[in-house]
Amino acid sequence: VRLADPRRLLGRNALLPSPSGGGGGTAVVGVTMELLFDDGEGPAELDSCETRLRAELSALGASVGLPTVGLVVRRHKTGATVGLPAAIDTLRTAIDVLEWAGVLAGAAPTAPVPPVDAAALAQRLQAERNPTLVTLLEEAARRDVPALLYDDGISLGHGEKSRTWSTGVVPDVGAVPWGELGHVPIALVTGTNGKTTTTRYLAGMMRAAGVVVGATSTDGVVIGAEQKESGDWSGPGGARAVLRDPRVQMAALETARGGLLRRGLAVDGAGVAVVTNVSDDHLGDYGVHDIAAMADVKMLIAHGVRRDGCVVLNAADPLLVARAAGVAAPIVYFAVDARHPVVVAHVAQGGGVCVVHDGVITLVQGRARTLVLPIDDVPLCFGGAAVHNVENALAATAAGHALGLPIDALQAGLRSLRAKHDDLHGRSLVREHQGVRLLLDFAHNPAGVAAALAFLQRLRARDAVPGRLIVLTGAAGDRSNDELRGVCAAIAAARPDHVIVRELDGYRRGCAPGEVPARIRGHLVVAGVAPGVIDAAADDQHGLTLALDDARAGDTVAMLIHIDGPGVARLLTERGWPD
């Protein structure tokens, strides 16, 4: 058995149980690590390792003076995830103790470690303990003032109602300006697909209400009109960057599963949480091997919402519906189909929903109906052809309404996103040139690819376009064969006339050049795509060049799993494509 990924859990997490309902210091923190099978190992070896681990942890904890009660061992098909609750001012020592107990139990570490020294660990624990910090956090919880704690300092309150102290500085309770500290309205957004678009919709709605908005996503951090960071900031670091900024009056935070699994939920006590959907993507990390386990991870943000807040869920996702009963905050469902059984039952029980009724985005609460905006007036919905973006618009509308945004702000936010690069960065970008239609979409998992291609098929049917369908695809090297099979099945179901499989340079993740495209080609053939219509490309620009050279007026090109945005943009400009 191998030991891997020892880490601190600094917020609400899927391993150490916390009561539903955010705020008030209810989240249980601690430390965790993975125990992974070596080749040929199985449950028997794990049984033995767990027995020894519990004994070694108890003995070492007693020697060091660290409580070790409440060890959690969650088994999965590649081993187990181990978690230990610990006080916030003991986490660094606790991770050392847990890791050492694992080594003493016979688990092989990922790197050499020095001999265990219980006396040194005990001294480290005493140095780490910080009664002033504990008292401060207890007082903040009593006053319902949110706290953010990390290596770069501690902050109390959020946004314009926050104060931050640098690393090593912990103020006395009496020195804190408590009357100036508190919450700002926060929306958390997660899900397998639609996170970024929904977050962008929400940020647009907030801006339209006239407030300074902090937003995070896989595209960066934006405060007001300033792009503070670029790249993927959908983890805890992005949330801290926004909520420690004293300009921020409202926040829309994309919350990816990676950060939830590595560190826990950074923000406890948000006003609203949105879970768009859960499907097959990123399985296998940190012991999450099936969609049900992933749903539990995604729903962490729902349990972190204040009891007087709101949780927005997809009525068409049975995994989310099944978990709604355990959420402390009220539920609002969204659905394209206003007659969906979950929607009908929820309304009958007095619950709120956001649906499409007679072509109009509509909020329903009991007998009251509020018409928001016709789908035809939401650019990214393409008259309803982009069903996935209709769902994103519904989710954002429900969340914005729950935060108290006025209807005109909801409308402005829905109109604000258009199919251009600056707005969407590779999500549902549709362009046309000389009779050829091009879709650039980040879709990279089976559900996302199926949704993107279904959208194109609806556009083609609506516009009576008889031409061919050319699909460009690829994958990162860490994608499982199950994920690749699902993506290839979705491509095959669209009956493409030409498929170009490209290498994603920089994303091979340990695979040899050509290895991933060869796997994709094999899965495409098994799914029913004729070998003669499959070509290979060296990268994004090469693949798109092949596709556009082949395309004729009336044809549709779908470039999925879009990576090299600037390079593709330059290529299209050089070929005369309008932005």
Task: Please provide the spans of the model-predicted regions.
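Flexible active-site lid/hinge loop adjacent to a nucleotide/diphosphate
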Residues: 223-333, 338-342, 377-382
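Residue-level signal for inorganic ion chemistry
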Residues: 140, 216, 254, 276, ...
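Adenine nucleotide phosphate-binding catalytic loops in nucleotide-utilizing enzymes
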Residues: 288-295, 299, 329-450
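ATP-dependent carboxylate-amine ligase
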Residues: 1-64, 68-71, 76-78, 386, ...
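Preference for protein termini
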Residues: 1-185, 208-209, 213
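Walker A (P-loop) phosphate-binding motif
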Residues: 175-219, 227
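Short polybasic amphipathic segments
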Residues: 153-158, 219-223, 359-366
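Gly-rich Lys/Arg/Thr-decorated short loops/hinges at beta-loop-alpha junctions or inter-strand turns
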Residues: 182-186, 215-224, 271-283, 375-377, ...
